[in-house]
């Protein structure tokens, strides 16, 4: 079904009537709120979003988004199911429009449109800025772990202390949140958990080895793409 609340609500209501009570009902919506989609569905505790990435047969990630009435029992069941078919479920803690990846992509997309509109770069130059820069790192680690490495031995704590003030600089059309102690603590704790006890040096070495191999692979396929 298309990304339309009215249509999806009607469809899920019908599915809810005929599905077994303990069957998970999941929509692959790209950004609609599950609570609204399943507002008329029977047994809403088993409803959720399962948002995959294209091409689905190549990308293992899937965002699992609960509604306000979704139970942990069914979220755990969905988590196990996706893992059983070699998917990597990303368990979103609570519903929000656009979920996670599309919100991040949308921010990058909008910023790119501003840059193009104001004549700073072409679409090709912008794409190359990602392809030959952060995009290479992002395929191995996300923004937060990357910035954790940027902080040197002290990791994210030092990174926030040194580069946190840059949030106030006019580098983006997007308004930055206030870098409060609470936000800083959450970011530092999160990246520390991601590091799994490994030092910044260890993670940097793994990243560098990966990037060497990735560049070899990219050269092989880039020639085909750019002919």
Labelled PLM ranges:
Residues 1-24:
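Rossmann-like NAD(P)-binding element
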Residues 2-5, 98-99, 148:
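Short, small-residue-enriched loops and turns at beta-alpha junctions
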Residues 8, 57-58, 108-109, 140:
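N-terminal alpha-helical segment
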Residues 24-94, 98, 102:
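Rossmann-fold dinucleotide-binding core
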Residues 83, 109, 114-122:
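C-terminal regulatory/interaction module of P-loop NTP-utilizing enzymes
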Residues 87-93, 118, 123-227:
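NAD(P)-dependent Rossmann-like dehydrogenase/reductase catalytic/cofactor-binding core
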Residues 101, 105-106, 111:
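Structural/interface elements that position substrates and couple domains in central-metabolism enzymes
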């Amino acid at each position: 079904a298309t990304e339309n609340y009215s249509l999806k609500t009607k469809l899920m209501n019908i599915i809810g009537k005929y599905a077994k009570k303990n069957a998970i009902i999941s929509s692959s919506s790209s950004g609609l709120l599950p609570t609204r989609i399943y507002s008329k569905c029977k047994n809403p505790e088993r409803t959720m979003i399962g948002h995959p990435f294209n091409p689905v047969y190549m990308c293992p990630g899937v965002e699992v988004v609960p509604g306000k009435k979704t139970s942990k029992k069914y979220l755990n069941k969905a988590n196990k199911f996706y893992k059983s078919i070699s998917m990597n479920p990303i368990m979103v803690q609570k519903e929000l429009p656009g979920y996670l990846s599309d919100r991040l992509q949308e921010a990058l997309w909008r910023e790119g449109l501003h840059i193009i509109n104001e004549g700073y770069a072409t679409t090709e130059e912008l794409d190359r800025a990602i392809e030959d820069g952060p995009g290479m790192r992002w395929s191995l680690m996300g923004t937060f772990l990357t910035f954790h490495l940027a902080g040197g031995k002290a990791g994210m704590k030092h990174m926030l202390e040194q580069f946190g003030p840059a949030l106030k600089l006019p580098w983006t059309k997007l308004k930055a949140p206030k870098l409060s102690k609470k936000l800083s603590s959450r970011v530092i704790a999160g990246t520390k958990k991601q590091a799994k006890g490994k030092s910044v040096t260890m993670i940097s070495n793994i990243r560098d080895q990966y990037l060497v191999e990735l560049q070899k692979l990219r050269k092989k396929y880039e020639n085909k793409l750019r002919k």
